[in-house]
Amino acid sequence: MAEAAYTPRLRAEYDAKIRTAMTEKFGYENVMQVPRLDKVVLNMGVGDSVNDRKKAETAAAELTQIAGQKAIVTYSRIAIATFKLRENQPIGCKVTLRKARMYEFIDRLVTVALPRVRDFRGLNPKSFDGRGNYSLGIKEHIIFPEIDFDKVTEARGMDITVCTTAKTDEEARALLTAFNFPFRQ
């Protein structure tokens, strides 16, 4: 007898409540028209890694701890003399989360990490891109519980992009609000 597959809390909530609420609000005719989360991209730019290669690897290790999935180091494509940057130098790291890991990360972001941000007054509601995707920046990655504060050499910022299948920003905002994203009024 096979055991039931694990379903993240937010995915179960989406299937049970959010999908029906969105259908009522926007009047979708088909279940496949209802917007859903597609992926979450975490990006950490490390400008200091031009001088020290290990900084990009350290950032990738910390991003791997935060995401629960291996982060890849990103390299420069062109040389820029003003930044003392040569081609193929490590300049950051990124990771793309989908399915169960994506829902788990969003759950941790909304319930644990964002309340730990200093002077947090809510997320900017104008950070949608016009196609239903939302981007936010975090100044210190140490707000995540996976990072050991004592072992961190320096606090780094990171970009988080939440990609949805929504066609408009209004639909995407309704979806993210249903997932308890704390937008400013």
Swiss-Prot record:
One Gene Ontology term from the biological process aspect of the record: translation
GO MF annotation, one: RNA binding
PROSITE patterns, per the entry: RIBOSOMAL_L5
One Gene Ontology cellular component: cytosolic large ribosomal subunit
Gene3D superfamilies: 3.30.1440.10
A Pfam family the protein falls into: Ribosomal_L5
Keywords attached to this entry: Ribonucleoprotein, Ribosomal protein, RNA-binding, rRNA-binding, tRNA-binding
Family: Belongs to the universal ribosomal protein uL5 family.
Quaternary structure note: Part of the 50S ribosomal subunit; part of the 5S rRNA/L5/L18/L25 subcomplex. Contacts the 5S rRNA and the P site tRNA. Forms a bridge to the 30S subunit in the 70S ribosome.
HAMAP family referenced in this protein's UniProt entry, alphabetically: Ribosomal_uL5_B
Function: This is one of the proteins that bind and probably mediate the attachment of the 5S RNA into the large ribosomal subunit, where it forms part of the central protuberance. In the 70S ribosome it contacts protein S13 of the 30S subunit (bridge B1b), connecting the 2 subunits; this bridge is implicated in subunit movement. Contacts the P site tRNA; the 5S rRNA and some of its associated proteins might help stabilize positioning of ribosome-bound tRNAs.
Protein name: Large ribosomal subunit protein uL5
Originating gene: rplE
